[in-house]
A protein has these predicted regions:
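Active-site-proximal cap/lid insertion segments
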Residues: 1-170
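Catalytic core of tubulin tyrosine ligase-like
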Residues: 173
Length: 173
């Protein structure tokens, strides 16, 4: 629905020579992760690897006030099982790939509108998820997998392929 609405808007904006602004906020890959079955099927459980730092339980949960009763941590059994972590990772990979396909549809529509060469695009996320790292599933931690989110910028004057490791906050944009 989000990609359809965005594409419809771009179709209208492409007919108008005035600048436009569009903010798109997908729910994915947040819970509930609801990827179509054909995306889930691309990630058979037997091919899903556990994170190298997999633990059945987060060892510092009591010290940081992160009990098993926190919402994200109730999404799977405690202690963590290898199967539950693999299922969560399967769903996460599938919904990310589905999101990528939807973003691709929007970018295709932008290209067809004739506005792609004079449009700035910023892609980011609000946080990552543990999805089995350190015995955690959610975002209630300060590990890099939860705090180091993508930020991609494309547009006139932005050098393709440039990388910058400086910290950024979405409000900086």
């Amino acid at each position: 629905i989000v990609a359809d609405d965005a594409s419809d808007y771009l179709g209208m904006a492409g007919k108008d020579k005035r600048p436009f602004f569009m903010y798109i906020a997908f729910n994915a890959p947040h819970d509930p992760r609801q990827a179509p079955k054909e995306y889930i099927d691309k990630y058979p459980l037997k091919r899903i690897e556990l994170p190298k730092n997999f633990l059945p339980q987060y060892p510092y949960k009591d010290q940081i006030g992160n009990p098993h009763k926190l919402r994200d941590e109730r999404l799977g059994p405690m202690p963590r099982t290898e199967h539950s972590v693999k299922v969560h990772r399967q769903e996460y990979y599938a919904i990310i790939e589905h999101l990528d396909a939807q973003v691709g549809r929007i970018l295709d529509t932008l290209e067809k509108s004739g506005q792609a060469d004079n449009t700035y695009i910023f892609f980011s996320a609000d946080h990552g998820l543990a999805v089995g790292h350190h015995g955690l599933f959610g975002k209630q931690n300060l590990y890099e997998h939860s705090t180091r989110v993508p930020f991609i910028a494309v547009g006139p004057g932005i050098k393709a392929g440039a990388k910058n490791d400086a910290p950024i906050y979405l409000q900086d944009v």
